[in-house]
């Protein structure tokens, strides 16, 4: 178990695996960037993929489409709440580390 020294939070193996999966998906998105796809387009595709995957995950355990449809608003509320919190946390982190992250992004672009 490691520690996030910035927030003084213990990082469990499960959390490490969570962040590694997220980083892998971000790497796939970054590899889509190029002359035919800018960050806004890739971001839109990533959001669509997340929505599509989430709909599939949310359907697990339902036997009838009608029952699934009845839960639509609760499912949306759950995912919107999760996304809002994750986006808020990441915007705060990015603002607090803006100069560092901009330098990392610049270094990545220079390496290409």
Provide a role label for each language-model segment.
Residues 2-112:
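Solvent-exposed interaction surfaces and binding hotspots enriched for charged
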């Amino acid at each position: 178990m490691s520690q996030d020294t910035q927030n003084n939070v213990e990082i469990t193996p499960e959390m490490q695996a969570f962040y590694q999966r997220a980083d892998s998906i971000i790497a796939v998105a970054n590899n889509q960037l190029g002359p035919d796809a800018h960050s806004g387009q890739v971001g839109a595709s990533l959001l669509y993929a997340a929505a599509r995957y989430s709909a599939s995950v949310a359907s697990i355990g339902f036997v009838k489409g009608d029952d699934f449809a009845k839960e639509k608003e609760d499912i949306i509320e759950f995912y919107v709440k999760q996304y809002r919190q994750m986006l808020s946390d990441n915007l705060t982190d990015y603002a607090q580390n803006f100069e560092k992250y901009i330098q990392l992004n610049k270094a990545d672009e220079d390496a290409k």
